[in-house]
Amino acid sequence: MKYKIEKNTVQETLILPLYSRKLCTELYPNLYRDETAVHLIDQIDYDFSQAEKNSRSLMQRFGALEVAMRQNDLAWEVRAYLKTHPCAAVINLGCGLDNTGRACDNGRCKIYNLDFPDVIALRQQLLPAGEREQNIPCLFRESGHCKLYLCLCARGTIKPKGVLPGPSSVTELPFFSFIEKP
């Protein structure tokens, strides 16, 4: 089954980074590999013709490489942190269809993927949560509520259910945060 992504929707914003990771996997296999991105592209019903046309340009390839290298940098940081904090919670804010948390899983950490409700709905279909992983719909409106909620989740005090409130500006948040489990 293919999952339809409509033009001019929040879900469409998932396409550029996903396609960029797929493109780099094909163009630079010795530098970057993301088989999940390749697999997901095949599961999505979307008109990729413009992305394919643009992928021939040097600027598009450079942009795709930037996306891929950012993923590598984030993964490196997460793995380094997990070496000294193996039971940490990895919080992937604005996760989209990113698989970095799972790719860095050390077998002991917990992974929380947060994004807008419609993005998480698609993610649940394409990348269902693993054993120590949760996909959490989040509205990103109230930062205090978001921080408290994440701390409680990381400590195992509460289990996410429904939609998580969050900060007023997504740009105020890093992609990954770490909360040490007590």
What are these regions, as identified by a protein language model?
Residues L150-P182:
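A short SAM/SAH-binding and catalytic strip from SAM-dependent methyltransferases
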Residues M1-I91, C95-C138, S143-G144, L152:
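Rossmann-like AdoMet
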